[in-house]
Amino acid sequence: MDSPGGVTDKKRISSERRKEKSRDAARCRRSKESEVFYELAHQLPLPHTVSAHLDKASIMRLTISYLRMRKLLDAGELETEANMEKELNCFYLKALDGFVMVLSEDGDMIYMSENVNKCMGLTQFDLTGHSVFDFTHPCDHEELREMLTHRNGPVKKGKEQNTERSFFLRMKCTLTSRGRTVNIKSATWKVLHCTGHIRVYDTCNNQTHCGYKKPPMTCLVLICEPIPHPSNIEVPLDSKTFLSRHSLDMKFSYCDERITELMGYEPEELLGRSIYEYYHALDSDHLTKTHHDMFTKGQVTTGQYRMLAKQGGYVWVETQATVIYNTKNSQPQCIVCVNYVLSGIVQKDLIFSLGQTECMLKPVESPEMKMTKIFSKDDWDDTNSLFEKLKQEPDALTVLAPAAGDTIISLDFSSNESDEQQCDEVPLYNDVMLPSSSEKLQNINIAMSPLPASETTKPLRSNADPALNREVVSKLEPNTETLELSFTMPQVQEQPTSPSDASTSQSSPEPSSPNDYCFDVDNDMANEFKLELVEKLFAIDTEAKNPFSTQETDLDLEMLAPYIPMDDDFQLRSFDQLSPLESSSSGSQNAATITILQQTQTPSTAADEIKPVAERVDDVKALIVPSSPVHVINDTSSAPASPYSGNRSRTASPIRAGKGTLEQTEKSCPGAPSLITVTLNKRSTAMDEELNPKMLALHNAQRKRKMEHDGSLFQAVGIGSLFQQTGDRGGNASLAWKRVKACKTNGHNGVEQKTIILLSTDIASKLLGQSMDESGLPQLTSYDCEVNAPIQGNRNLLQGEELLRALDQVN
């Protein structure tokens, strides 16, 4: 009898035998299956190198695809191919820019052409038999399913069912920009333009042996073309292709110049304009949908569409558009388009848009703009040529024609012989106009002080229409009695050599001719008088021709007349009440004030006249005062001056800022040389309220600029330079400069000296004063009170009661 242990061993041995037999049977079945799959793989139309390395799943997948393709091919009637056609079959795929793909109604890739490897990096056998949804972008699946659907609904008579398909599909790509292949997990998305048809195939023998009918086979045949990135285009573009860049709203930001030869447009006229303005109206809906796909998928191909030419008609164009993303934030930045022109201009004489008309592309100039261009030209010809120019612009003549109710001012071209002779004697300077005769020029001593380059001005001189200049002069010559305020400054006159000369020298406070109205123009005054309008109207000649020639035409006087607009005009007030200064010396002689005229360029003739005078001068120093209106350094208690007298007055202008004037008043002994005297009066408070606010603003601007750019007050006072006049009684008609003297009184002659340091703005302020007889406390700022307090012998500022007493004495 067997023990229980022996029974257990028998069962275990039998179980192991069964398992071993089972493993052997499975091994046998697998080997037989492998043989079958191996034989099946060799039946597939594949190279041996490919079929020998296929697994069972791949063999089954490829076999199913092959059977479907056979069914698809058997559905149609195959025609016998000629030998020539068979030889050309190998060139079809090379001619394609993409690859061929056949999809079943379920989305399985029945067939993929072998050139898919060059486009996507994936091999033909890796894709065939797989579902297309495994290799496409998830956002494109819905659109792809819609394209695979074949609607069998009723179709209207006369219309066939639309079987064409065109869409954009993002598919995995394992190719890099350098041509290398990466793993499928590192693949990127590439946009494919898929175009084709959906087909329904019925086999010839659609009935099986059982008698039921086979369903038709539906498939989608596509040609997939990848859209190249603009940065990867290596083939040079031909003459029928042009590049363009657009903003996100499809406005041109760049266009290739080849568009001019192809469509007639200039690249500059397209910038900033939308591309939709140049689309044919029938293609606008299709292009709108294409642009929507472009922003969704990154790249599109528009297909053939019509783009309007410039002069009329259209051309057929196909565009590849690519969205360029910012590398930092991955946001869309711009759109680059490669445009292929497929045809010439079609229907050139047909206008499809208003933009094709020349009047819309070329802006029309108004008559006012035409007249401005005509009168702003420098190359003025005679009156006949001007008439021809105006005759060519009939619309512009209406601008010059007077309207109803306008006053027609007649132009007086007559001239006086005395004025012509006087104009011939006036030397014209490039910067400063000196309207005086030769007799007056002998009595004027000009202190040359060149201006910096930033303050140079152009002369108010023109070779333009003289009639307009005369019109301005006639408006600037009102009756002298009606003037309320005039800029007058007495001129320096040499001491008369005879009593007859002294009797004939009389002071005339009013300007006698339009020459006296000429003045030097400051940079700040240019805005006041609107000189830019004068320059455009008179076509200013920047360089005077023969400025010192005494043979000038009779029209130079009118050219020198300034132009003052009516809205910027201000009334002039005469400055004829000049308070004389009493002199204690009976032997002192009459002295006139010196007029310092500043100009930018030193004339050669004037330089020749000053040279002999300068040779007799030992030393000449200019004193520049930057700040405070008036500084008086009084070494004595009082300094009486000689009575005031002058030859005549001329109209003066506001003096340039940045130039200081120094004038000295001292008591002269009998027999001593005559001294130059400058008399100034304090500005009355009541007059300040009546002054033009524009002139006050100009006065303050000049004072501020002088305080910023000039030297300090202490340096100016330390120089102590002063001008002194010496009379040459031997017949010399000109004034000579003498050595600059110190401010302190010399002990050996006992002459009391008083130095007055004045600014050009203060002179202009005093000229605006109502009368020299009136006196009042000037308006002082806080800065003036700190600097200009009376200085006593101890050289300390007054404080407290002493300051109050000093102010009471002034009042």
From Swiss-Prot:
Q: Which GO terms describe its cellular component?
A: cytoplasm; nuclear speck; nucleus
Where does this chain carry the motif Nuclear localization signal?
A: 703-706, 718-721
Region of interest: CTAD: 771-811
Q: How is it modified after translation?
A: In normoxia, is hydroxylated on Pro-402 and Pro-562. The hydroxylated prolines promote interaction with VHL, initiating rapid ubiquitination and subsequent proteasomal degradation. Under hypoxia, proline hydroxylation is impaired and ubiquitination is attenuated, resulting in stabilization.
Tell me where it resides. Answer: Cytoplasm; Nucleus; Nucleus speckle
* All residue ranges annotated as the bHLH domain in the record: 17-70
- UniProt superkingdom: Eukaryota
**What's an example of a GO molecular-function annotation for this chain?**
transcription coactivator binding
Q: Where is this region: NTAD?
A: 529-573
Which Gene Ontology BP terms does the record give?
A: cellular response to hypoxia; intracellular glucose homeostasis; positive regulation of DNA-templated transcription; regulation of transcription by RNA polymerase II; response to hypoxia
Name any one Pfam family assigned in the record: PAS
Q: Where is the PAS domain?
A: 80-157, 228-298
- Residues modified as (3S)-3-hydroxyasparagine are 788
Subunit structure and binding partners: Efficient DNA binding requires heterodimerization of an alpha and a beta/ARNT subunit.
Q: Which PANTHER family does the record match to this protein?
A: HYPOXIA-INDUCIBLE FACTOR 1 ALPHA, HYPOXIA-INDUCIBLE FACTOR 1-ALPHA
Which protein, by its recorded name, is this?
A: Hypoxia-inducible factor 1-alpha
The gene name on file is HIF1A
